[in-house]
Design a protein with these regions (language model features):
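Membrane-interface segments at or immediately adjacent to transmembrane helices
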Residues: 89-172
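Short aromatic-glycine-enriched beta-strand elements
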Residues: 192-203, 246-250
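Beta-strand/loop nucleic-acid-binding surfaces
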Residues: 209-222
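OB-fold/S1-family single-stranded nucleic acid-binding modules
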Residues: 241-267
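Membrane-embedded alpha-helical segments of integral membrane proteins
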Residues: 3-59, 67-68
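Transmembrane alpha-helices and immediately adjacent membrane-cytoplasm interface residues
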Residues: 46-48, 52-102, 106-107, 111-114
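Short nucleic-acid-contacting surface segments enriched for D/E, G, S/T with interspersed K/R
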Residues: 38, 219-232
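OB-fold and OB-like beta-barrel modules that bind single-stranded nucleic acids
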Residues: 180-186, 227-236
Length: 271
């Protein structure tokens, strides 16, 4: 009976996340079909377990002892309890501040920082190179970069956000002087009073590999507070950042508009 309840719980959890609109805060929505497959499988297995319990079918178990069985079921029930009872919190500039002002995957940054944190979190630039061979990655990004370089003005949307950002950081010199427009939340650079980053939190596969991606901005005529959402338009230049000890693609802002926070603040990488 307990196995049926646990499996039914996973089925109900997936339905809850879907109907409440919270599923997009846990996984890349391009892979949402996997969640639906797991939901169907959970339902089928729950029905099987209900049948076994009602018919008193003898089954073999590798778990010897009541404590082992209870412990295994309790561990399986933890995700259900967490998913149904814990509040969902959107990542924002407080998350960036909590990690400290350093970007572990930026070129020239001490990699020992990342090792000591035990994290592979990505900052500024999305990096999908680990999912391709070197040749395949270079070909993929070259094709993407050429697509956007051919445009007079690059409109960065929810759909292409991570692809464009990765291309900009891979080919900063080629994108210099290109006009771009995108929406993100403000993160004030604690090292420079008049500098602000414009970020979006992006998910490659699931929330575990999420990172904060965007551009340093210059030329703001108004200083916004952290977590203020704006749409900015301007030209890309390469700016040397002393703290990161590297050139960063930077948006020289020509116009900006304060906007409401999107219903879904996350962006996703499409492959």
């Amino acid at each position: 009976m307990m196995r049926f309840l646990v499996l039914a719980g996973y089925f109900e959890l997936t339905i809850y996340l879907h109907l409440s609109g919270k599923l997009n805060q846990y996984i890349n929505m391009h892979y949402s079909y996997l969640a639906y497959i797991s939901m169907v499988l959970s339902f089928i297995l729950a029905v099987v377990q209900l049948y076994i319990w009602m018919k008193q079918v003898k089954t073999h178990s590798h778990l010897n002892g009541r404590l082992a069985k209870v412990t295994s079921l309790a561990l399986l029930a933890i995700p259900i309890v967490v998913g149904l009872t814990f509040p969902t919190v959107s990542l924002d500039s407080q998350t960036v501040s909590a990690k400290g002002y350093h970007f572990p995957l930026s070129e020239g940054t001490d990699q020992a920082i990342q090792t000591s944190e035990g994290t592979t979190s990505q900052y500024l630039k999305p990096d999908t190179s680990s999912y391709f061979s070197k040749t395949a990655y270079e070909k993929e990004m070259r094709t993407a970069a050429d697509q956007y370089l051919s445009q007079d003005s690059i409109q960065i949307t929810n759909e292409n956000y991570m692809e464009v950002m990765e291309a900009i950081y891979d080919y900063p010199d080629e994108f210099e002087d290109k006009t771009v427009q995108f929406t993100g939340f403000v993160y004030n650079d604690p090292s420079h009073a008049n500098s602000q980053f414009l970020f979006r939190f992006g998910i490659i596969h699931c929330i575990a590999d999420s990172g904060v991606y965007g551009l340093l901005t210059k030329g703001n005529t108004r200083q916004y507070e952290n977590n203020t959402w704006i749409t900015a338009k301007g030209k890309l230049v390469n700016h040397y950042h002393k703290e990161l000890k590297q050139n960063l693609p930077t948006l020289e802002i020509e116009s900006f508009t304060k906007v409401d926070k999107p219903e879904n603040p996350y962006v996703y990488r499409a492959f």
